[in-house]
Regions:
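C-terminal ends of transmembrane helices
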Residues: 2-5, 74-89, 137-148, 191-202, ...
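Entry/N-cap segments of selected transmembrane alpha helices
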Residues: 82-109, 179-188, 322-344, 374, ...
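Functional cores that coordinate and move charged inorganic groups
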Residues: 140-247, 252-253, 257
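Predominantly late transmembrane helices and immediately cytosolic-facing juxtamembrane segments
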Residues: 4, 9-10, 205-208, 214, ...
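Structural signature of hydrophobic alpha-helical transmembrane segments
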Residues: 61-72, 120-134, 175-188, 227, ...
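Transmembrane alpha-helix boundary signature
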Residues: 28-40, 54-58, 74-89, 107-126
């Protein structure tokens, strides 16, 4: 198990697993089992209540609205942590990557709209706005020390803001007809979670029952995408621990002294007194970690190595068997997505960064050259999972969805290769 743990502990591992999952989906979609592959994810699964189906959705729907809700829950936890004490805590230190992220979302959307304005394909404008943080950071960490630490922080902060932007786009622009009664119940459950947080409730069971059985289900029934419920629920999770740092340190020092005073035996097992002390240390350590960070720590590897690969396998498969070049480019969807990601992302990020530096609103991070900035802009054009997710919300027509996926693949592959080549070359600081 040690090699597996070491692999999962590496920053680049998530990107590698995701890439393999995308490759597997492409293979499955273009072999003689393609029909079974597509049919499998269309099978229904749900509940029967009083003889009536309840939440009776396809496996594809469950993955996109259920499993991906866990992904967005972790995104919400990360956003809250960053707002409280992370990269987004001090707006002055993050003004440049925040501005770059906004530019990197606006320009791709404008390019797409410029090519598709006035057509039914307009709804796909949100597809080229998103960056796949797992892939982008995976490439950066593959390069190791060739990318300065300041550049990694810049890209991470940019990706965090990009995630927040994607969440807001989904909430406001990719929501179907609303059931206000269900939505009202959803916000009522959120209010109870908020009140529980303010009252100092730190029980995982309390937030799990209200978050899943209350907020997620009601938002799913309301018409608002259930992933938004996950982000909102994450913001209700307590960020403070049951005991503060000073109390924890006092307890640990006291318990350590007790442990030292216990009579040690000459065998490999511990004395009962020592076991009791270590049990208390284990308990105090667990309650010294905020529930927010406990959940983030436990769920992050599940999201990276289980949920994201499943999502990729279910959504990344494109069958090229009966797909011609004329089919792909019969509309401007593929072109809009490709140019939006491949050109729009770098232009938006680099242009906004240069403008803010010229206006002296911010300064370029130390040790970050112009070539590094361009390389990071290219890596931001890797859309993959987030772009594919938005494409499933934007298009119901299979051909348009396929065109969007082709555009995402083209831009992500070219952007990833281009960014890697640029960042792999040592440069002098600008």
């Amino acid at each position: 198990m040690l090699p597996i743990k070491l692999f999962m502990g590496r920053e680049k591992s998530g990107g590698i697993v995701l890439l393999l999952s995308v490759a597997l989906a492409m293979v499955l979609a273009n072999t003689n089992i393609a029909t079974s592959y597509f049919h499998f994810f269309e099978q229904k699964a749900g509940f029967i209540i009083n003889g009536q189906p309840f939440l009776d959705y396809s496996l594809h729907h469950w993955i996109n609205d259920g499993l991906m809700a866990i992904f967005f829950f972790v995104v919400g936890l990360e956003l809250k942590r960053e707002f409280i004490g992370g990269e987004l805590a001090d707006i002055r230190n993050t003004l440049l990557p925040i501005g770059a992220a906004i530019g990197g979302m606006v320009v791709p959307a404008l390019i797409y709209l410029g090519l598709n304005f006035g057509s039914p394909q307009t709804m796909g404008w949100g597809v080229p706005m998103a960056t796949d943080i797992a892939f982008a950071l995976g490439v950066v960490y593959l390069l190791g020390d060739k990318v300065p630490a300041s550049a990694k922080v810049f890209l991470t902060t940019l990706a965090i803001v990009d995630d927040l932007g994607a969440v807001l786009v989904i909430a406001f622009f990719y929501t179907s007809e609303l059931s206000f009664v269900s939505l009202l119940f959803g916000f009522a459950f959120l209010a109870v979670m908020f009140i529980g947080n303010r009252l100092g409730i730190k029980s995982l069971l309390f937030y799990a029952v209200l978050g899943i059985g209350g907020v997620w289900v009601t938002f799913l029934l309301s018409g608002i995408h259930a992933t938004i419920a996950a982000v909102l629920a994450a913001f209700m999770i307590p960020a403070d621990a049951k005991i503060n740092e000073s109390i924890y340190l006092k307890r640990i020092k006291k318990l350590t002294r007790r442990f030292e005073q216990e009579d040690a035996n000459e065998v490999i097992t511990l004395e009962e007194g020592q076991v009791d002390v270590l049990t208390h240390i284990q308990h105090d350590t667990s309650i010294a970690i905020p529930l927010l960070q406990q959940l983030e720590h436990k769920l992050a590897p599940i999201v990276t190595f289980v949920i994201m690969p499943i999502f990729a396998i279910a959504n990344a498969g494109i069958s090229f068997t009966n797909l011609s070049i004329s089919d792909v480019f019969s509309t401007h969807v593929a072109l809009g997505v490709t140019l939006g990601l491949l050109l729009g992302k770098p232009i938006g990020i680099i242009g906004t960064t240069v403008l803010m530096v010229k206006l002296r609103w911010a300064s370029l991070p130390s040790a970050m050259s112009r070539r590094t900035l361009i390389g990071l802009g290219m890596l931001a054009s890797i859309g993959f999972t987030m772009s594919m997710f938005i494409s499933t919300l934007a298009f119901t027509d299979e051909l348009l969805l396929t065109q969007a996926k082709v555009g995402i693949f083209l831009a992500s592959i070219l952007g990833g290769i281009g960014g890697y080549i640029l960042l792999n070359q040592p440069t002098k600081k600008a």
